[in-house]
From Swiss-Prot:
Keywords: Cytoplasm, Nucleus, Ribosome biogenesis, rRNA processing. Belongs to the TSR2 family. It comes from Schizosaccharomyces pombe (strain 972 / ATCC 24843) (Fission yeast). Pfam families: WGG. The gene is tsr2. Residues 140-150 have a biased composition (Acidic residues). It comes from the Eukaryota. Signal peptide: none annotated. This is Pre-rRNA-processing protein tsr2. Required for 20S pre-rRNA processing. GO terms for cellular component: cytosol; nucleus. Residues 123-179 are annotated as: Disordered. It is found in: Cytoplasm; Nucleus. InterPro entries: Pre-rRNA_process_TSR2.
Length: 179
């Protein structure tokens, strides 16, 4: 794993994603939804921005990457400032991993995978399994999937019995389907 030079960019994208997901500031931002409800999507977008910037810029420096990180945090995550050096340390790690990958040295990416990537993958698999076990889907008469906790089958029967709703002017009211 991590030894095919033709997949250099893919390996680097993976390493950036793992480092960004493991960065305590970003973990807190996602948990507390600093960027509204789509914070995880913005984190993933940020990873793409960092990959694009680092791979396109010749002689990229950690200071420049740190500035980009801070700018994105300010614009997208509403972060005024960060009190520690962690953005610079993250930027340094990203630049070092890219420079090593450009020399076909994938050892830093392997280390990131062993140290952080496996834990993230196991955590995600655990979350998926927990979600599936706690809320199994139930098939109802009209073959729509409804959550068991929802009481969706009883609600579906009520809607069928009610029929269309007509307003005072004689128009049929279109209602949004409840999930």
């Amino acid at each position: 794993m991590f030894d095919d030079p033709s997949k250099r960019l893919t390996y680097f994208e993976y390493a950036v994603g793992v480092l960004l997901c493991s960065w305590p500031v970003m973990k807190q931002a996602v948990e507390e939804e600093w960027a509204d409800v789509d914070t995880a999507d913005k984190r993933d977008w940020m990873a793409g921005v960092l990959v694009d910037y680092i791979t396109v810029t010749s002689d990229v420096e950690a200071w420049d990457v740190e500035e980009l990180i801070l700018q994105v945090l300010q614009d997208e995550f509403n972060v005024g400032s960060i009190e520690d050096d962690s953005p610079y340390i993250l930027a340094q790690d990203l630049v070092n991993v890219w420079k090593a990958a450009c020399e076909d040295n994938y050892e830093p990416i392997r280390e990131i995978h062993e140290r952080l990537g496996k834990q993230l993958l196991e955590k995600e698999e655990g979350k998926e399994k927990t979600r599936e076990e706690s809320n199994p889907p139930v098939l109802v008469e009209d073959e729509t999937i409804v959550d068991a906790e929802d009481g969706g089958a009883a609600q579906n029967q009520q809607e069928k019995q009610q029929g269309p709703i007509v307003d005072d002017d004689g128009f049929t009211v279109v209602q949004k389907r409840r999930r």
